[in-house]
Amino acid sequence: MSLGARLNARLRDRRVTHALRRVLDDFLPPVIREWRPLNRWMATRFHGPAFDLDFKERAFAMSSRQIAAAYAALEAGGGRYRDTDTTPAQIAAITAAARGRVLEVGCGNGAVAERLAAAHPVVAVDVTLGSAAETRRRAGCAVALAGLPALPFADRAFDTVVCAHTLEHIPDLAAAAAELRRVAGRVIVVVPRQRYYRYTVDYHLHFFPSAAPLVHLFGGRAELIDGDWVLVAG
């Protein structure tokens, strides 16, 4: 296996990229950490040439359709470099906390939905066609093309809603949180523990170095698992 292939294989491990992010965010001087050429190189390495380094500067003025198109372009350009951002320990925590009929919002390629569908009736939604199709194939559950902050479901249509590695991408965080609380009695959320920088190798718009904002939005209790916050409320 070539050096590049070995590096890519290691980067597919979420725990490895957590360690790398900690080095970059906590130990590099800000003048280096925010150096645009370094971030451009890293973004291309992780996500391919379609990655927009200035996305977070523009996203708050974009429509939901424009944001969905940006993610579709990133996905089409090879932007998905790992099977899922949710680690096995996080998936285990999610499945242990889920109850009854489950909605997954931001299903990606279906890694979480696949596990949930083994024990629960599951409906999954995502804003990109590729993700929705892959989830349908992999999890065998009902899938819809939809996303936050407006879900096409009645109040309390589900017992549990799962939203893993999605909230940090939604411009209107308060509206998204209210929508998750509306459709289900129990909310399970996973977000990265990450501090803000102008340039990050992702399309994150919100940052959670502490779980306090998450608990304020949903109540419940947040636990740090494999470097990410996992919150269960309701």
Segments from the language model and where they lie:
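Short catalytic micro-motifs in class I SAM-dependent methyltransferases
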Residues: 165-169
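A short, conserved alpha-helix within the catalytic core of class I
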Residues: 170-179
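Conserved beta-strand signature within the Rossmann-like core of class I S-adenosyl-L-methionine
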Residues: 184-196
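Activation segment
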Residues: 152-155, 170-171, 198
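A conserved beta-strand element that flanks and buttresses the S-adenosyl-L-methionine
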Residues: 162
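Conserved N-terminal segment of class I S-adenosyl-L-methionine
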Residues: 1-154, 177, 201-234
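Conserved acidic residues
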Residues: 100, 159, 185
